[in-house]
């Protein structure tokens, strides 16, 4: 092989090495996105390769190597949302809107997306119950699940989303009552004090609207409860929400009087109460000076004249009072409010003459008085407007000749698109600038516009200009926009407008451009003029995506370009090789400091590199080698996943336990330093104490006090030979509870153990319980309190049931594990034994009306032998079962657990403040005859310090 060929091959190999180590996407993120790609029948075009951040996958936004945004609206995606989505732990935005072929339930572990701010699934076909785990998305601001097929009830846990701004579940099949908190543990929607939007319309929600739902502390501006099955009266507490601007309670089964306390909502712009079962008379609402729209149609109100106070509403634009048994003549000043545009009074008993007089609003366009008793009509001399008097006596006498005797005919021909452009090819549309293109199209649904007339084209021209100006201001790839086909839904009076958005500089959008435009609407980034009110945008399927624009007109040009690119790549590789060599040199220099943070530590001097220890000593390798007789087999007393545990004797005669990390468990130097600093701060008589460490000769060792009587598991199983009567079990429960409460509440920073079990509770020579195996893994972000959690992900039988949904372990997870330990102390059984789960066995067997709750056959024989002195037994069982409640919010804190055990001990005639349990004459025999207390299952170290966020396995 020639030297030139060899050099070329080396260069190629080097290039592939660079590529292999320089992927720009975090491994778990890449795996999650590839799972999406595999799950979807029609993944987005351009999702090629295995490095989404590096190859710029459509709709994917990254920061560094982490995926922070997925925006894939209106891409005709088909399939389900796989559980792998939960691995995108840095994701802030998930927008899959307007993909109607996306179906199935949302994965329960969607709650693992702890940094998610925007969850936008509008216009898909997702179904099933909204996952309870959504309540764990503490950063969530925007939750849009409308226009899907969700069923079931609203999860109460959504009340925990303290930052939620937008909550939209409209147009689904959600049923049941609105959840409110119970004031103690159960959350509810009344806790959403920062939320501005409750959009719950067009579902199957039922029951009374809870009075507890509303308070003066809320920030709501839109409450849209229309099209449900709510019953009862409007709660008075609603009037406390002074920020409300839109209230839609129409199309329900509400009863009682329309309350006068609605006058307190002085910022209200739109009030919809139509199609309910209200009775009584319409109250005076003259305090609502900002009211644009009032709709009280189709209620069984008492016969009454047209209220004169209507003319005192200065902002009123649309008035609907259809079918509410109005009678008598129309007051002469009725049409005088200066902003009044539309009046609908049909299906009443209004009599005499329709006379607009001279004091009529200059804005008035449309008056509908069909099906009344009008006998005469005097048109306004100075105003052209549309009046409908069909099915009134005046029309029966005049016949069908006058135009006002014809039923309404809506004009939907208005369009801002030009009609004088040259014809376009089939499928294309002419833009306002007469360019033929494939526009991105859809329908704007305005849920409560403050006008109802379809005749004033000025409003729609304003809308068209506002949308175009928005896209121009923020540099969207948009040439122009147009609106057309304006119509009103007669059922709910929503205003529907077709929108066309034309691409800039090309015939069609690419997927990125179209997603940007769609996101502006799905995320409500675009805000329409206020008169249009809240809206949703339902996009049409867009398939005319432009391909990547590559010039291929000349093969010679292609060859030339290829040659130039080849030379550039070669030079680039040579440059990279040089840079790589320099960086490797510097990296090697840095590695010394990172891998050995104690390298510059002079024990005789003060140094910033010295670990800040509290009572822990730095041992040399030679010191520990000597005290373990060269780590002899005789001193090998067990171990776990971290490595082996050796017994040693210090020169002063003190017994120590040395945990020696095996190669696969070694941490980074800085991580090890951080860990020993934190472990050295833990000082409590019920927690195994760190005496020191060794970071020498590429070894990492932790030195602990030696606990002679092994684990609680050994004693319960009979392995240790120690007899545990009821008194001793209570003292062990109290001691281990105090140790765990210390870790939660007094350690600095607080520590979440994450693997509480009987193997990790050790007993000293006095049977004092000591919590072990709380090796640290990472700080958990909490603005109020910083916790440290352990690497261990828990043990079957002790594992918090909520973990399976959230993949998160908390202080309440430790409480659950401790509750299982309490039941172990009671039964002497392992958590799972012969396929039976001790928690379920106790719950099933228990009968509170009988002695000892009828649990005798489950109790440990040692307890049965002392059954005559089981004072506090029932309270102990109650406490254990509270600790193993399915939901963490229903479990006590460890501080509360300790207080209850102290009370139980007092009931048993014991002093909860005594320092130790009773001694045992079997201690020496146990130590000699049962093997070492640090057996293979005991005291398993969990101290691997992950460099990045801990992910579920």
Curated annotation (Swiss-Prot):
Resulting phenotype, residue 436 to S: Loss of activation by hydrogen peroxide
Glycosylated position list: 182, 217, 264, 284, 298, 411, 456, 459, 510, 523
Gene3D superfamilies in UniProt: Phosphorylase Kinase, domain 1, Ribonuclease Inhibitor, Transferase(Phosphotransferase) domain 1
Record-linked CDD domains: STKc_IRAK
Coiled coil as UniProt keyword: no
Effect of residue 421 to S: Loss of activation by hydrogen peroxide
Effect on the protein of changing residue 659 to E: Loss of catalytic activity
Cytoplasmic side stretches: 580-953
Biological process, per Gene Ontology: detection of chemical stimulus; protein autophosphorylation; regulation of stomatal closure
Tissue expression as described in the entry: Widely expressed.
Disulfide bonds listed in the record: 421-424, 434-436
LRR repeats: 64-88, 89-113, 115-137, 138-162, 164-187, 192-216, 218-241, 242-265, 266-290, 292-311, 313-337, 339-361, 362-384
Disruption-associated phenotype: No visible phenotype under normal growth conditions, but mutant seedlings exhibit reduced accumulation of intracellular calcium in response to extracellular hydrogen peroxide.
Parts of the chain on the Extracellular side: 24-558
Intracellular or extracellular location(s): Cell membrane
Keywords from the UniProt entry: ATP-binding, Cell membrane, Disulfide bond, Glycoprotein, Kinase, Leucine-rich repeat, Membrane, Nucleotide-binding, Phosphoprotein, Receptor, Repeat, Serine/threonine-protein kinase, Signal, Transferase, Transmembrane, Transmembrane helix
Reactions listed under catalytic activity: L-seryl-[protein] + ATP = O-phospho-L-seryl-[protein] + ADP + H(+); L-threonyl-[protein] + ATP = O-phospho-L-threonyl-[protein] + ADP + H(+)
Protein name: Leucine-rich repeat receptor protein kinase HPCA1
The gene coding this protein: HPCA1
